[in-house]
């Protein structure tokens, strides 16, 4: 017994000694844990790198940096002091809304000094930049490595054969480089390997499958983007190879087009739990063999655009399936049938991604999935009422039904108590948001935009975790009070735009939230400026346009948050000092103060601003201050003010300018030459000023689409560079100037030209015969698009874009008007009020897409356009006050869209062709043509109307003939009924028997309904905008 006591005492003392030595070694005095030899090796390694972001600032040989075990990214064995871990990986940083992400990478080359670290078992150098060099062979000598990650680090070349020496490796990640795989025999030596990624490598080895299956312990394999569609394993390889341990398989982006190219997956093992095949080119039916993978939990088939037939019935065998993603696969299937085929996973399924497909039907039966957490169904063709499908779903956290055709009232949302995000935008829901919304205590994002909802409940104010609320573009009405907003302490994005709401709060109300996005256009916030904005310190977007504010800017309003990006106060009646408002911050991207009562001199253009709108105000004086601008906006609109004086000649500094609108001011003098240096310019409006002199050259502005210089006093001839250099021009308006000379035929090279207005000048000579080269005018469709500028980036957490739509002053159907976005619907040529001579070229008749042609008030002779009947889209034709002669062509009657016609004051003769269309015009359309006759003018002398044709056939009794014509025989009716039943049941029978025909038929019906709905929405939206502008 005493022996055991002494033995235990000795063991205790020994352990205590070890602990004392370890503590002393690690913490005592000035003694360092780091070994000198390994410190020197690490410093040599550092010298081979370029550290632009100070990742290795803690590394050094200074006295206070001697302990290398405390350097960033270094770990040591606490007992021996040997370096065991080097972790210098970087992470991508993606700023909100950025199209690309950034990583603060190390650059340079790897030093073989790492070989001195003989106990190194963990090396992570991922997401760095090693100059597209080959992976150093010496890494294959770090034999104790268990973890090696060189992914996304700009390596290239072949994988060193020396990797076969890394027999202790459990994780090897070489993905996202530019490696070439010619030999994989080294893999068979890595008997402990559990994770392997060779993603984005260029496979040039035919026996890759055979070699990979020689790694018996492999659990996860990533071969994404390796071009495996061209390297299908042979049947012999499939028969003799397997990977029983494999659980997770990544095969994204391999250009697989059919299941035969990845059928080897089903030979590997039946134990797979996760497969991703997203971003391939799969087509046809989904392989039934997925249903044999009884352990499958995760299946991703997203972004394969040609999958047909939907979910196969074999998926009912996947009783462990937790995650299924078939988004953006163009799947056409009846949704209730799809849910039925997933019934085997009704207890396990947690995430179901079906967005961006062609699913139809209602979402009934969605409640059968008792574990469902996330359901993505946006951008389909779902219809029916939400109420039909509502049932208690206590687990659902994310539901997206946006951009469908669902209708009716919303259900009691308290049925979804776990919801964190609810997206119902762009449907046809009606009624009020249910009172039960207030019970969703975990709700963070609520989007009900673009529906027909009418009211907001006060229970909204109970959503203390709500971060984003978007109810824009509904028909909400009534008053929002403090009760609606009382507890929304987490709210950062509020969008109630384009409703009929009034926001009424007490004068000293302090909101419980700090918003990043405030979007309240068309909400009634006035007449006074909303004082609660003074409490908001973090917003990046402030849009209170159309808000019925008629007040002077308060002094506190100029103290903006430093990150403000969008400021929109347009369409109010606000007055005050603009200079204080926009000169106190450098973060602006968009400033829109248009349609207000601001006055005074032009303020300096703020630094970094991209869109700057001051139009429809009362600014006055010179704009020479623009030369002091330190920024180059993308879009600048100063139109409809009282600016005067000469235009400054400093535009060469605004190199980014794409839209410049200086119309409707009092500018005088010549157009400065520096405007011609704006190589990014797409639209230039300077109409209705008093500019004089000749046109400067815009030949460098080769992207110019709109050139509107009408209503000035410009002189000289039309320059040839318009036709040779401005080949993208779509609108050319030089109307109401003092130009002379002939119309140069070189402008016929403008194949994209849609609107040509040279009216009211002094142009002479003949009309060129090449107008049929205007390709867009030759096409009989509307191909116009608005000019659109998107401000890059997210503001708050959510994307925003800003749209610029230009206008044009044109003579359309005998009325001079301004048209917003004329490129969408106008195709016109106006050469009126000049001194043109000669005949009208017959080539004009080839312009079948032309909608308005005005050649009036010239000295043209000859006949009305030969072949004019081809111009079937023509709505307005004015050839009055010329010297045209001859008869009116008969095919003029073919122009069924023609609503304005004026051929008066010519020398036309003969009878006006007979048609309901031509006789419906007023007499003034044909007046002052001395020899023209026929309705609606006086009848032609001696004209006798043609007699009705009478059938003198065998039946000599007209009454009997009429009866025979009027009453078909009984046999006719019987055959008609039989034909209807045969056709009806024949088509219906095919739809019942053939599911693919049935799906295609219903998809056609749904597509047609969607198209009609979309068209009606577009026209309704345009009508709303016109009505708002009219107000």
From Swiss-Prot:
Stretches in topological domain Extracellular: 30-971
Keyword Repeat applies: yes
Gene: EIX1
Source species of the chain: Solanum lycopersicum
Stretch list, region C-cap/acidic domain: 919-971
Name of protein: Receptor-like protein EIX1
Assembly mode: Interacts with EIX elicitor protein.
UniProt region (N-cap), positions on chain: 30-113
Membrane topology: Single-pass type I membrane protein
Cytoplasmic side: 993-1031
């Amino acid at each position: 017994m005493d022996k055991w006591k002494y033995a235990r005492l000795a063991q205790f003392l020994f352990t205590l000694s070890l602990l004392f030595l370890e503590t002393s070694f690690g913490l005592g005095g000035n003694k360092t844990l780091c070994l000198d030899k390994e410190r020197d090796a690490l410093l040599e390694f550092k010298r081979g790198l370029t550290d632009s972001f100070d990742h290795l600032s803690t590394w050094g040989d200074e006295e206070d940096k001697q302990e290398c075990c405390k350097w960033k990214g270094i770990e040591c064995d606490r007992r021996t002091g040997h370096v065991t871990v080097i972790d210098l990986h970087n992470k991508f940083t993606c700023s909100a809304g950025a199209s690309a992400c950034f990583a603060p990478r190390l650059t340079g080359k790897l030093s073989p000094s790492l070989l001195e670290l003989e106990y190194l078992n963990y090396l992570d150098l991922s997401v760095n930049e090693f100059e597209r060099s080959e992976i150093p062979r010496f890494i294959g000598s770090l034999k104790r490595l268990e973890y090696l990650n060189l992914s996304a680090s700009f390596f290239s070349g072949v994988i060193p054969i020396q990797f076969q020496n890394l027999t202790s490796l459990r994780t090897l990640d070489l993905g996202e480089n530019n490696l070439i795989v010619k030999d994989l025999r080294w893999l068979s030596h890595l008997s402990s390997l559990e994770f392997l990624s060779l993603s984005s490598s260029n496979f040039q080895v035919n026996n890759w499958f055979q070699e990979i299956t020689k790694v018996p312990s492999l659990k996860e394999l990533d071969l994404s983007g390796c071009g495996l569609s061209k390297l299908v394993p042979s049947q012999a390889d499939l028969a003799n190879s397997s990977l029983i341990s494999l659980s997770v398989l990544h095969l994204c982006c391999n250009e697989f087009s059919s299941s035969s190219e990845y059928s080897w997956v089903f030979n590997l093992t039946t134990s797979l739990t996760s497969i991703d095949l997203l971003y391939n080119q799969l087509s046809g039916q989904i392989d039934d063999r997925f249903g044999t993978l009884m352990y499958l939990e995760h299946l991703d088939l997203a972004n394969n655009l040609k999958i047909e037939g939907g979910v196969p019935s074999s998926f009912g065998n996947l009783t462990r399936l937790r995650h299924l993603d078939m988004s953006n696969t163009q799947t056409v299937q009846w949704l209730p049938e799809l849910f039925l085929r997933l019934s085997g996973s009704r207890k396990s399924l947690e995430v179901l991604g079906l967005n961006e497909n062609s699913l139809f039907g209602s979402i009934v039966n969605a409640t059968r999935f008792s574990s469902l957490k996330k359901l993505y169904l946006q951008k389909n063709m779902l219809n029916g009422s939400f109420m039909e499908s509502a049932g208690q779903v206590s687990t659902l956290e994310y539901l997206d039904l946006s951009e469908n055709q669902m209708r009716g009232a919303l259900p009691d949302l308290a049925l979804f108590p776990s919801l964190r995000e609810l997206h119902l935008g762009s449907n046809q829901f009606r009624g009020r948001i249910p009172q039960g919304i207030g019970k969703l205590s975990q709700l963070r994002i609520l989007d009900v935009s673009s529906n027909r909802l009418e009211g907001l409940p006060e229970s909204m104010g109970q959503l203390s975790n709500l971060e984003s609320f978007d109810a824009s573009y509904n028909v909400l009405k009534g008053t929002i009070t403090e009760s609606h907003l009382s507890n929304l302490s987490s709210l950062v994005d509020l969008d109630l735009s384009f409703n009929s709401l009034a926001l009424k709060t007490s004068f000293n109300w302090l909101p419980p939230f700090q918003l990043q996005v405030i979007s309240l256009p068309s909400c009634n916030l006035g007449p006074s400026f909303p004082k609660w904005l003074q409490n908001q310190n973090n917003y990046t977007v402030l849009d209170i346009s159309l808000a019925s504010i008629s007040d002077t800017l308060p002094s506190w309003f100029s103290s903006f948050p430093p990150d403000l990006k969008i400021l929109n106060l347009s369409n109010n009646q606000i007055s005050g000092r603009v200079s204080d408002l926009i000169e106190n911050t450098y973060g602006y991207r968009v400033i829109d103060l248009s349609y207000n009562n601001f006055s005074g001199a032009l303020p300096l253009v703020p630094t970094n601003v991209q869109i700057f709108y001051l139009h429809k105000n009362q600014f006055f004086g010179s704009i020479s201050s623009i030369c002091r601008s330190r920024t180059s906006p993308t879009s600048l609109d100063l139109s409809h003010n009282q600016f005067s004086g000469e235009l400054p000649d400093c535009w060469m500094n605004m190199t980014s300018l794409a839209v410049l609108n200086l119309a409707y001011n009092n500018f005088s003098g010549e157009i400065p030459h520096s405007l011609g240096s704006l190589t990014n310019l797409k639209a230039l409006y300077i109409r209705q000023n008093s500019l004089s002199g000749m046109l400067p050259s815009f030949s460098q502005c080769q992207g110019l689409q709109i050139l509107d210089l009408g209503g000035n006093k410009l002189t000289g001839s039309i320059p040839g560079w318009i036709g040779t250099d401005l080949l993208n021009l779509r609108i050319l308006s030089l109307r109401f100037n003092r130009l002379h000379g002939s119309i140069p035929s070189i402008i016929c090279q403008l194949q994209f030209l849609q609107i040509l207005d040279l009216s009211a000048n002094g142009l002479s000579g003949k009309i060129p015969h090449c107008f049929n080269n205007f390709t867009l005018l030759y096409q009989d469709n509307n191909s116009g698009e608005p000019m659109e500028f998107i401000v890059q980036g997210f503001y708050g957490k959510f994307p925003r874009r800003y749209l610029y739509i230009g206008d044009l002053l044109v003579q359309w159907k005998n009325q001079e008007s301004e048209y917003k976005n004329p490129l969408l619907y106008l195709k016109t040529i106006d050469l009126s009020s000049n001194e043109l001579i000669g005949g009208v070229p017959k080539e004009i008749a080839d312009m079948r897409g032309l909608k308005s042609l005005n050649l009036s008030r010239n000295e043209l002779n000859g006949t009305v356009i030969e072949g004019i009947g081809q111009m079937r889209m023509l709505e307005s034709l004015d050839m009055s006050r010329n010297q045209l002669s001859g008869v009116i062509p008969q095919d003029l009657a073919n122009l069924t869209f023609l609503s304005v016609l004026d051929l008066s004051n010519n020398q036309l003769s003969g009878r006006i062709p007979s048609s309901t269309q031509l006789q419906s015009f007023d007499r003034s359309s044909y007046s002052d043509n001395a020899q023209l006759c026929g309705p609606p003018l006086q009848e032609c002398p001696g004209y006798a109307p043609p007699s009705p044709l009478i059938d003198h056939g065998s039946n000599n009794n007209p009454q009997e003939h009429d009866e025979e014509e009027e009453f078909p025989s009984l046999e006719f009716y019987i055959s008609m009924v039989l034909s209807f039943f045969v056709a009806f049941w024949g088509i219906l029978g095919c739809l019942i028997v053939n599911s693919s025909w049935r799906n295609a038929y219903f998809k056609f019906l749904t597509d047609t309904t969607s198209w009609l709905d979309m068209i009606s929405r577009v026209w309704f939206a345009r009508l709303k905008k016109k009505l708002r502008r009219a107000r």
